Each structure stands twice: as C-alpha cells, then as structure tokens.
Amino acid sequence: MKSVRYLIGLFAFIACYYLLPISTRLLWQPDETRYAEISREMLASGDWIVPHLLGLRYFEKPIAGYWINSIGQWLFGANNFGVRAGVIFATLLTAALVTWFTLRLWRDKRLALLATVIYLSLFIVYAIGTYAVLDPFIAFWLVAGMCSFWLAMQAQTWKGKSAGFLLLGITCGMGVMTKGFLALAVPVLSVLPWVATQKRWKDLFIYGWLAVISCVLTVLPWGLAIAQREPDFWHYFFWVEHIQRFALDDAQHRAPFWYYVPVIIAGSLPWLGLLPGALYTGWKNRKHSATVYLLSWTIMPLLFFSVAKGKLPTYILSCFASLAMLMAHYALLAAKNNPLALRINGWINIAFGVTGIIATFVVSPWGPMNTPVWQTFESYKVFCAWSIFSLWAFFGWYTLTNVEKTWPFAALCPLGLALLVGFSIPDRVMEGKHPQFFVEMTQESLQPSRYILTDSVGVAAGLAWSLQRDDIIMYRQTGELKYGLNYPDAKGRFVSGDEFANWLNQHRQEGIITLVLSVDRDEDINSLAIPPADAIDRQERLVLIQYRPK
C-alpha cells in the first residue's frame, strides 16, 4: 500500500512540475525559438536529413535532437508544450535511468525513489529539462551510456558483456548525432578512473571494440546521407563547432576555469546542503566500486568542461544524474546517523526563500529602485514572485519540523517556481525575450506582410514559428546564420543597412514590408538610419516599422 502511495505521489510530482505548467510559459529567444522553428520546418518540408533554420542550411548541430523535437510538435502541435515535449520526455527518461541504476547498485527501492525525486527537483535539471534545448537529449544518452558500461562490466558471461558494450556504442552514436563528438569524449574520461582503480583494463580492451563498431554503425546511415547531400557539413561541424567553439582563443562563451563552481552551487538547490557530504562520502568510500563509479561520472565531465575555453551551464547537466544518486545515498545515511546536513539544507532553503522575498520587494514598484523590474500595473506578477519564494521558504521550514522524516519535502521547495514562473515574468523582459508576446501585440500588422526583415536571429525564429513562415529576411546582422547565408541559393535572404533603401525601392510595390528591430530601451527610434516609414509600433525593446506600397 505504501508503494502505491509513493507512486501516486511521484506521478503527481511529475505532473505539477513537468506537465501542467509548461504551456503557461512563452518561448524564450534565441534558444527555444530557434529549435522550435528548425523542427517546424523539418515537419513542413519533410526533410529529415539536413537541418534548416529560416529555410537556410543550419549546421551547428547534428540531426537527432531535431528529430525528437519534431516528433513532439507532430504529436502535440505547434504550441509551447509541443516544442518542449521532447526535452521533458528526455528528462523523464533520464530520471527513469536514475531509478533503475540506483536500484541496481543498492537494491533499495526507497533510495531509488529518493534519487529520482532529488534529480527531478534539482534547480539546474528542472530549468534545463523544461527548456527546449538539446542538452537534455545528450544528458540522456550520456546517462544511458553510464548505465550500459556498468551493465557490461558487471556481466558474468561474454554474451552479457558484448550486449552491454554494443548498447554503449549505440548510446554514444546517438549522442554524436545529437550534439557531436563530445558524446565520445565524456564517457571515455568518465570511465577511465573507475577502470584504473578496479583494474578492469582487460575487459575494456577485449570488448571495447564492440562499442566502437556499434557507434559507427549508428551514425553511419545519416552521416553518409548528409555527406552526400551537403559535402561540407562534417568539415564545418568538426572544425567550427568543436575546435573553435571549445578549444581556440576565440571560442564561443569564453569563461574562467572556476565558472562551474557557482553553477554547481545554484544548480544543487534545493539540495545544496547535501552537496559537500555527498562528495566527501563518495571520496571516503572510494574503495566501493559503485561509489567511485558515480563520483567519476560527476567529477570528470566537470573537469573536462572546466578546462575547455567555451562554457555554458547546460554542458554539465549529465553530471547531476550521478550526483543525485550520491546525494540520496548520503541523505539516508545522514537521516539515520547525524541529520546535521539535513538541517543545514533546510536552513539554506529558508535563507534562499527569504532572500528572494526581500529581493522581489527591492525590485518591485514599491521598492527603492528608480526603474523597478515590474511596473505598478504588473502587481499580480510581483505577488506571484513572492509566492514562489514564500513556498520555497515554507517547505524549507517544514523539513526542519521533524528532520529525520520530513527532509524529503525539500523536493517541494521549487513547486511555486514550477507553477508560477510563467505568470511572474516582467513585461519588460517579455518584450525583448518572448517574440510570441510581440507577435500577439502586432498580429494584425504582421500577418499581411509580403516581406519581414529583422536584425535578430532569435526574433526571426520566433516570428517564423509564430507566423508559420520561413522566409524571414535578416537585416544588418547575420549572426549564427552567416554560414548558411553564404550559399548561392541563399541570395536575397540578407539585406545590409547600406542596401536597405535601394532594396526597399525595388520591392515596395510587391506588398507590405515590415521591419522588426531590436533597440535599447532608451534609444530614440527617430534616429535610426532608415527611410521614413508609414507606420511605427514600438513594444519597448522591439519596434515594428512598416512600409506600404505607393
């Protein structure tokens, strides 16, 4: 009976966090709008080999993540939930692997359930796992690889070992098809410390080639297909998207070595109090095969991405699966022997909630700021934000009432965040980061436009997805579409600032021309170097400028 209650509670938890509130949040640009539009175009064109964005070749990532996103929009429609369905599915599958792997390591159903709940409620997992990017997919394949390698090395027969390594190769191959060759580097680096400490080199060398073969066979069909269609894909993807992005001095998203320290700290909420003890206990028990394996899968990817010059918080998502298992194991030990860490965790959550309440007041219309984050007419959003932090502090307090039994309720600290964050985003943020909001405000003007030009790729993708058209033209800036715009068949998809007046004269009689520009909040739009317009509609950070036929 208790198991049934636990399962019902888990499903209710998943529904409240990962299903019910998702449609209430508008898509963010540039990431979510980009991936939403790529998948929409894939469904519309039927081209499942070459990814396109705004009708242009888009070679920044391989294809597998777009397949899953496209299936999500195919099943649930071109809406906010449909766009995010793929990442939610991948996150829940990863949680299922956490359950299975914890159960296999410790044979403890309660521990397995706690590890799953901890994983799904970690701030970084929830933030990225409900956000339409490709990282939850690669995290799933990496965690699947972690499970497959363990399965192979624990098998007692050659058939079991062979099956495990073949499965490992498939997960690595799908990882390569999702985000590239990092899906090969991370598993290798993660298993080497365990192989070395357990002296399992023989099995690795005997059966490892099976993983190589199955990985190659997984990637080969699509790899050959895109090489035939687009011969320069692999050259661009390897040199630009891997070498330049991560290793060279001009790498994207450059950050210092310690960049991931605050990411780990913030990402571990609402379980931050367990982080030091989980890592220390894992190191202290490193003679235990399972513990050192989980510790290696937590630390090695973190070190690898810390050394790389290009860094983003999403890169280390896979580390938190093994970390959640270590946290759950440590939490049960602490509850039994010394609940000090659990008490500290409760106080951390109270402090976080109270700090958030105070910070919300400071940036509210009633606070001391001259330019508050929310305006007076957005009072309900302020109360939503207060509710988010109040619930966080409340459940932090509740875990302290009988800490040996109530500590798992820390998983409910982010409940307010999950349910209310979509209702608390300030208009000033929505106007710049949510193109859907802009489209809703300017729908009547945008719909009849013959041409739409914009100076932001993220906004362009949002306009394309909302309006169901891929012919948005880039104006002044090419951004990440620079490579695709260099192809001969992309001529006419970019208009520079100097060329715009002539281009306008040539195309004005074909229909309404709409220019959507991103501007600074205090920028005077009358000073823009553009021909006089027939209509201007400013929505704070985005401006709609229209030219009608004469």
Swiss-Prot record:
It is an enzyme of class 2 (transferase). One of its GO terms (biological process) is response to iron(III) ion. It comes from Escherichia coli (strain SE11). InterPro entries: ArnT_tfrase (IPR022839), Glyco_trans_39/83 (IPR003342), LipidA_mod_glycosyltrf_83 (IPR050297). This is Undecaprenyl phosphate-alpha-4-amino-4-deoxy-L-arabinose arabinosyl transferase. One of its GO terms (cellular component) is plasma membrane. PANTHER family: MANNOSYLTRANSFERASE YKCB-RELATED (PTHR33908), UNDECAPRENYL PHOSPHATE-ALPHA-4-AMINO-4-DEOXY-L-ARABINOSE ARABINOSYL TRANSFERASE (PTHR33908:SF3). Keywords: Cell inner membrane, Cell membrane, Glycosyltransferase, Lipid A biosynthesis, Lipid biosynthesis, Lipid metabolism, Lipopolysaccharide biosynthesis, Membrane, Transferase, Transmembrane, Transmembrane helix. It is a multi-pass membrane protein. Belongs to the glycosyltransferase 83 family. It comes from the Bacteria. Pfam families: PMT. GO terms for molecular function: 4-amino-4-deoxy-L-arabinose transferase activity; mannosyltransferase activity. The gene is arnT. Catalyzes the transfer of the L-Ara4N moiety of the glycolipid undecaprenyl phosphate-alpha-L-Ara4N to lipid A. The modified arabinose is attached to lipid A and is required for resistance to polymyxin and cationic antimicrobial peptides. The chain crosses the membrane at residues 7-27, 81-101, 111-133, 137-154, 165-185, 204-224, 255-275, 288-308, 315-335, 346-366, 382-402, 406-426. It catalyses: 4-amino-4-deoxy-alpha-L-arabinopyranosyl di-trans,octa-cis-undecaprenyl phosphate + lipid IVA = lipid IIA + di-trans,octa-cis-undecaprenyl phosphate. It is found in: Cell inner membrane. Pathway: Lipopolysaccharide metabolism; 4-amino-4-deoxy-beta-L-arabinose-lipid A biosynthesis. Its EC number is 2.4.2.43.
